[in-house]
Amino acid sequence: MPASTSIPETPSKLPDALLVNSDPASKVDNVSVKIEQESPLALEGSPLPTVSDVLPETNNAHEEVSSSSWSLSSSDSIMSYDSLSDDVSVLSFLDCPLTTFETAPSIASFSNSAADVSSHSRSSSSWSAKLSRFTKHASKPSLSSNSSDSSFSKSGSESNALSSRGSFELEPHGIHRHVSRAKRLLSKFYSKFHHKKEDSSFDPLAPLVFAPNTSRVLRVTNEANASAISLEKATSLSSQEQPGSEIKKELSLYDHEFDQILDLAIKAKKDGNLENAIEFLEYIMPEVASQQNFVPYELAELYKQRGTSQDLKSILPLYMLAASLGHDRSSFLVGEAFFYGTYGARENKLRALQYYHLANDKGNADAMLALCKLYLRGLPGHIFPSSRRAFEYAHRAAMLGHAPACYVLGKFYETGVGCVKDLAKSEAGFRAGLINDSPITDADALQIASTLVLLQ
């Protein structure tokens, strides 16, 4: 019998140098740290970081690959762009998914347990230091091993303090204490527009932080019934009195009917009666500004049309008041005022960048286009140039149907800066931007287009 050849057995255990760890958990200083695959910390191009998170980008090739979860997904679906039909919306040819704006993820979804955090060394917790940038109230691990009880009691008191604070104080991008700023601005205008017939015991700042008083709601309802009965009589008598008496009569009858006075202001603005519209809005502004944040914005726009020296001084405070109450257009205009130093504001690029981000979070397309311009060129001392992030801001604004942003997005695809060059999508963007054959007059859009031509 021939001697059997021995077949070498496959080793049951590979050498340590050839082992590949497929588990998403990695070892850092003998401590297992769970890394979420969908966590923003695992994505180098996470969308909309804070100003301090923007880092220099040294590899353009890597910048093309890294993208946020809402960025362009042209590799997923391939469409034919040979012919562009007018029957289909040109925005559909951009192959950009319509998604909601992403918010900052919850800290609890990618935070470690208390035992893991306490066992980390300072050299191995760089990811937790980066994580703390998402919120200024992030809990810090204690360096002392004997202070666990005190740290737990401190975190409990901090959570109670957070629950009692207003929602405006937790706004991102460094703009905090919006309620206190709104109360301070509103108190100035209330002292200016205070009326003798107004109840002196009523606090106009209460609606900013408290629910409407039940007794006051009942009193307003009773006065509404009385004013509705005498409305027809007041209208007939106003034509026989002096020209300025009509407004005073209506204000006395509609003493607390703010919605109806607001309707009168809107009607006066449409009719071109600027003085009446301003007087109506000045009267109701301290009362309704907290519930209807467009009232300070509309009053500032009327002041801008009238154009007196006193009016021009009041425009920026009114814009800041409306921005503090969540008005997106006012946030963008305050950013413009700080960026260019207009309306009496001192030029402050960082403050302008913060207000641009605040307006962007509210969904303002003009602010997105302004951020696109800043990230494309860079802002010395604050942000580094990033063509990819500039493309994402233009993409988001174009998905809102903003015509200048559609034109800018077409220019991105034409030049191939920050994205893959695609002439078909470029043509679709240009057609979406030229609505009703109107030329692009937006200053930011024209500056971005000229910059893209230089960068290609």
From Swiss-Prot:
Keywords, ordered alphabetically: Phosphoprotein, Repeat
Residue windows of the Sel1-like repeats: 293-327, 328-364, 365-402, 403-438
GO molecular function annotation: enzyme activator activity
InterPro entries attached to this UniProt entry: Chitin_Synth_Reg (IPR051726), Sel1-like (IPR006597), TPR-like_helical_dom_sf (IPR011990)
Lineage, highest ranks first: Eukaryota, Fungi, Dikarya, Ascomycota, Taphrinomycotina
Name the record gives this protein: Chitin synthase regulatory factor 1
Origin superkingdom: Eukaryota
Gene name of the record: chr1
Modified residues (Phosphoserine): 227, 230
TM stretches of this protein: none
